Every structure is written in structure tokens, then in C-alpha cells.
Regions:
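Defense-system signaling and execution modules centered on TIR/cGAS-STING-like, death/scaffold domains
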Residues: 1-17, 33, 110-113, 121, ...
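Switch/connector loops and helix/strand junctions flanking conserved nucleotide-binding motifs
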Residues: 48, 77-80, 179-184
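Walker A/P-loop-proximal flanking segment of P-loop NTPase domains
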Residues: 1-46, 50-59, 124-126
Length: 337
């Protein structure tokens, strides 16, 4: 079966070239075994969802856990209506559970629940009746805002002491930002500025970019399947241009293999990679456009503008620096940002 380089949504091993997703998060398995709650945060399109879906499937296949990844993104439409948001969220959770888990691991029931407690009551009942320890990964957590976000975080914190018999054995929140940067408009603040509604997390993790060897191995998969080679200098140029950012690594290769060099008998050169770069810049795909939109935020401009001007960075909050790092708009180097 042919395969492609993926630039949209989670990778699927049967149709996409991909690296081992769980190899990027080896520290999570022992953390889960210790009944911990944690946060995974990284920019969009670096493989968070792919990695956590794969980990959930591996944990379930081991026979030791009931593990599933669910999303709360549908609740983003109701920032000041937690009750409506909870109902919408639980509806999508049910669909995800029925898709990813075998019937014998499904919840025995989906209780109606009390307003402001629907998430915690559902998780509590499922944990009590599950034949295995329950592990939940909650994706797109930072798509929520205001009262809905606070309500769900507090429900998770409230249930934490009852684990593992009365609440999930282990739980992870997945998003672009760490907890303190979740957006909460109430009280006049744009951010939570505290981890207190989820101060039960034991650690925060982030997913880094691909290494040069990762890029080389990913492109080699295409060579092994089709016979078309990436010249060594082409791989080096791709890594130089992308710094290993997973979406960019795949986007360059996708543009080259599907549009610029479709004849597999012709090797992929530096010129091919450079042409693909120019096409991506001109096209302004959604991922790049959304990052450009972040540059208009005041706390982003306060850091990016001095860097571009070659000036010393002013006294800015560490949280703002971490925010830019999480978004992938800057990185730590030998001489600082």
C-alpha cells in the first residue's frame, strides 16, 4: 500500500510515513504506573495527538489498563456555559470510547450527572466499574476558556484523591500551553496565571522537534517504499530549513514527492527542497497562518521584536518566554533565546 507524508491530523501507520510516536515520550509509562496526573504541552503539529493515541492503544493492548484519549474541543463554543459544554464534551467522549475501546471495556452507563459535576461523576462511575485501571488523556484542554475551563479543572482536582478506585488511575492534559497559560477572562486576566485549579499535576512535558537522524530516518522510509532517494545534501537542507519541526519536515517532503518530483526514478535534490520551501511560504498554509496571527499578541511582540532587531531582551515574565517556546516561535540557544 502506498504511503504519504502527513500534514493534517494524527498520523496513521498504514498510510503515513511516521516515526515511533511513543519513543518520543518514554518517561510517561513509569509516570502512569505511579498513578500520576500530568500535562503534555507543545506547539501544534508536532505529534502530540499521534503520540498519545498510540500510547493509549499500547496501554490497552498490554492488558494492564483501559486507556483512551478524548477531546474537550467541542466545549470551546460554550466558555460561560459549563453545563452545556459538559454535555457536548461527554457526547464526543462516548463516540471516542466506542471507537477506540473494545465493548468489554466501555463504561457500564453514562449518568446524566448534576450541573457542574457531569465530567467528574462520569469518570468516577467508570473508574469504579472498569475491570482495569482507567487511564484518560484529555486533548485540546486549552481550547476551553473562562468558567467552563475552571469548572472542568476543578472537577478533575476534586476527584484526584479518590483515584484509582473512584477516579482515573492516571490522567494527562494535552494542549499547546502549560496550565498557567490557559486563557481565563474572568477577573480581568487573560490567563490563569496559576496552576491552582490543576495543582495536582506531578510534571509538565513537552515534545521537541525531530533530530537530524529522525528526519533522515523518516525520509528513508519513502526511499525504502518507492526507491526514490533523498540526496544527503537535500536531507541536510530540509533539516536546516525546518530545525526538525515535524510539520515543516513533512510539508517539505510532501510538496516534493507529490508535486515537484513525482518520478520516483529521479532523486530529490537541494533544489527540490528549496522550491518546496518557497511554495510553502507563498501558500501560507493554515498552520503557518495561525502562528503568524500570534505575532500580533502584545506579549509575543515584546519578545520577538527585540530579537529580530538584535537588541537585548527586556525584562519580561518567564511565563511569556515559556509561552513562546511552547508555541514554537522561538527556542533556547547557546546565547539565550
Amino acid at each position: 500500500m502506498p504511503k504519504w507524508f502527513n500534514t493534517a491530523g494524527p498520523c496513521k501507520a498504514d498510510i503515513h510515513y511516521m516515526l515511533s510516536p511513543t519513543a518520543r515520550i518514554p518517561a510517561l509509562v513509569p509516570l502512569i504506573a505511579q498513578q500520576n496526573y500530568f500535562v503534555i504541552h507543545a506547539p501544534r503539529q508536532v505529534g502530540k495527538t499521534t503520540a498519545m493515541l498510540a500510547l493509549a492503544q499500547e496501554l490497552t493492548a498490554s492488558g494492564e489498563y483501559t486507556a483512551v484519549m478524548v477531546s474537550v474541543e467541542v466545549g470551546a463554543a460554550f466558555p460561560e456555559q459549563p453545563d452545556i459544554a459538559e454535555g457536548a464534551i461527554l457526547g464526543t467522549w462516548r463516540s471516542a470510547i466506542e471507537h477506540w475501546l473494545p465493548a468489554e471495556l466501555h463504561p457500564t452507563e453514562y449518568p446524566a450527572g448534576m450541573e457542574g459535576q457531569k465530567i467528574s461523576q462520569f469518570l468516577s462511575l467508570w473508574a469504579k466499574t472498569s475491570p482495569r485501571p482507567l487511564v484518560i488523556f484529555i486533548d485540546e484542554i486549552d481550547s476551553l476558556q473562562d468558567q467552563t475551563l475552571i469548572s472542568i479543572l476543578r472537577q478533575l482536582r476534586d476527584g484526584y484523591p479518590r483515584r484509582p478506585q473512584g477516579f482515573p488511575y492516571s490522567l494527562g492534559l494535552i494542549g499547546m500551553r502549560d496550565v498557567r497559560d490557559y486563557k481565563v477572562a474572568s477577573g480581568g486576566s487573560e490567563r490563569l496565571n496559576t496552576a491552582s485549579p490543576f495543582n495536582i499535576k506531578v510534571r509538565s512535558f513537552t515534545l521537541g522537534n525531530f533530530s537530524f537522524e529522525d528526519v533522515k530516518n523518516l525520509y528513508q522510509q519513502h526511499t525504502e517504499l518507492t526507491g526514490q532517494t533523498f540526496l544527503p545534501e537535500a536531507v541536510e537542507q530540509a533539516f536546516y530549513l525546518t530545525d526538525g519541526q515535524p510539520w515543516l519536515v513533512n510539508a517539505l517532503a510532501k510538496e516534493v514527492t507529490e508535486y515537484l518530483a513525482t518520478d520516483v526514478n529521479i532523486p530529490i535534490t537541494v533544489d527540490c527542497i528549496n522550491q518546496a520551501k518557497e511554495i510553502l511560504i507563498q501558500r501560507q498554509d493554515t498552520h503557518l497562518d495561525s502562528l503568524a496571527e500570534r505575532l500580533r499578541e502584545e506579549r509575543v511582540k515584546a519578545i520577538i521584536q527585540p530579537i529580530l532587531a538584535g537588541q537585548d531582551l527586556p525584562d519580561v515574565p518567564n511565563d511569556d518566554i515559556r509561552y513562546l517556546l511552547d508555541l514554537g516561535l522561538c527556542k533556547n540557544g547557546n546565547q539565550g533565546l
